Amino acid sequence: MKIDGNTFICRFNVAILDDGYYLPMDKYLFVYHDQLEYIGQLNPNIIDQAYAALNEEQIEEYNELTTQNGKVNYLLAYDAKVFRKGGVSQHTVYTITPEIASDVNEFVFDIEITLPQEKSGVIATSAHWLHKQGHKASFESRSFLFKAIFNITKLLHIKRSKTILFTSDSRPNLSGNFKYVYDELLRQKVDFDYDIKTVFKENITDRRKWRDKFRLPYLLGKADYIFVDDFHPLIYTVRFRPSQEIIQVWHAVGAFKTVGFSRTGKKGGPFIDSLNHRSYTKAYVSSETDIPFYAEAFGIREENVVPTGVPRTDVLFDEAYATQIKQEMEDELPIIKGKKVILFAPTFRGNGHGTAHYPFFKIDFERLARYCEKHNAVVLFKMHPFVKNRLNISREHRQYFIDVSDHREVNDILFVTDLLISDYSSLIYEYAVFKKPMIFYAFDLEDYITTRDFYEPFESFVPGKIVQSFDALMDALDNEDYEVEKVVPFLDKHFKYQDGRSSERLVKDLFRR
């Protein structure tokens, strides 16, 4: 490698990079180690030169591309190196393509390998077929049993059973919106008239407890009121009695990232004939502005979306609780006493629970630590529960950083937070209640819009400064450039009520009390 100022020229042999073997298929960053780590960036001159070499037809193709990364990658593709076996093979090919990786918005080498598909033997093919058929038969038998229990129970409870059910496939206990609704049911003495039941599962990929395999369909068929707070696939496979209320108290506040039918046509989104979400008879939201978005997302009528406020935000308006929790948080996290507290709480990257991660290399921890030292600050990292790759805080940084990802209730952390750094997390709604500054570190904004998208334009919607590089993030911190004037209008738009009585309104609306 040769380095001249801010430019470098690098030459390497892909055939021996992986401990004497060829570099396997993946995307690779360029990282230069010199006490600190520096991520290699693409020289803009290369792009200018590549564009200048295009002919008229290529310029037309280039102009048809809608994203900046797409345009850059179109130009970089001409520098791809393709190695074919024997020089002509179509089946054994090793390709190295320079590109801007859209998921992290960084310059990488994308290596792809094409190899001839091995023919499976008769025994292996038969074993695979039998395994697949066995899995299918198991699923069908479990589905039949579930629906049979549900339908029998439903027939036995044509009249009201005086039962309320809280159920989730992504929550281990009575927490979040469920907890506040439950407490309000007790306060209004609804439990005097109804038997309250719960069936939970920690996440959607876990196996259900053996007992709950029977309890869930039984209670779904019996209950008069069924509360859910997330995607719950089993309830979409059955047909409820007309008298049953299926109530969605969605776990996130506001309408930020698209969900449900708003993602039709995108990866992971349902198709228009899907039964997902359509079972809900009521959905409760924070403001009238959310109504059309949630109706679209769930495939339900707008009159079934009710803006009573979100139950778990009630605590944010409770001054007595604020005093109590601040003291509890200082006792639990003594590192924050007398410090400026920055909460770094991004959402996950990936397509869902199984692939969720966060690219920690997008954070220059040494530089952030120096900021903390200079400004008497600490950073609390609260990663999304789905994120599999854990944050590794070095010994020398432990006086500045702490990982609070295992702290279940993020709302408690907000009470001691002076500045929020996030990206596309709906946590911004709750934090807006405190009328404090936010920075949006959206390094992959273009890709996120393409793959996930938002209900409103991100740039004009979010209540704070948007930065798309770590340098810009540090500049905003150093200059206290937060665009905090956006917070109060955002709060007033998305919180119809700011009185801490959302749970009360919801229960009164359902039970006419």
Curated annotation (Swiss-Prot):
It comes from Staphylococcus aureus (strain NCTC 8325 / PS 47). PANTHER family: TEICHOIC ACID GLYCEROL-PHOSPHATE PRIMASE, TEICHOIC ACID RIBITOL-PHOSPHATE POLYMERASE TARK. GO terms for cellular component: plasma membrane. Its main location: membrane. Belongs to the CDP-glycerol glycerophosphotransferase family. Pathway: Cell wall biogenesis; poly(ribitol phosphate) teichoic acid biosynthesis. The keyword Cell membrane applies. GO terms for molecular function: CDP-glycerol glycerophosphotransferase activity; CDP-ribitol ribitolphosphotransferase activity. This is Teichoic acid ribitol-phosphate polymerase TarK. It is a peripheral membrane protein. Can catalyze the polymerization of the main chain of the major teichoic acid by sequential transfer of ribitol phosphate units from CDP-ribitol to the second glycerol phosphate attached to the disaccharide linkage unit. It is an enzyme of class 2 (transferase). The keyword Endoplasmic reticulum does not apply. It is found in: Cell membrane. Gene3D superfamilies: 3.40.50.11820, 3.40.50.12580. It catalyses: 4-O-[di(2R)-glycerylphospho]-N-acetyl-beta-D-mannosaminyl-(1->4)-N-acetyl-alpha-D-glucosaminyl di-trans,octa-cis-undecaprenyl diphosphate + n CDP-L-ribitol = 4-O-[(D-ribitylphospho)(n)-di{(2R)-glycerylphospho}]-N-acetyl-beta-D-mannosaminyl-(1->4)-N-acetyl-alpha-D-glucosaminyl di-trans,octa-cis-undecaprenyl diphosphate + n CMP + n H(+). Signal peptide: none annotated. It comes from the Bacteria. It holds the Pfam family Glyphos_transf. Its EC number is 2.7.8.14. InterPro entries: Glycerophosphate_synth, TagF_C, TagF_N, Teichoic_Acid_Biosynth. Keywords: Cell membrane, Cell wall biogenesis/degradation, Membrane, Teichoic acid biosynthesis, Transferase. GO terms for biological process: cell wall organization; teichoic acid biosynthetic process.
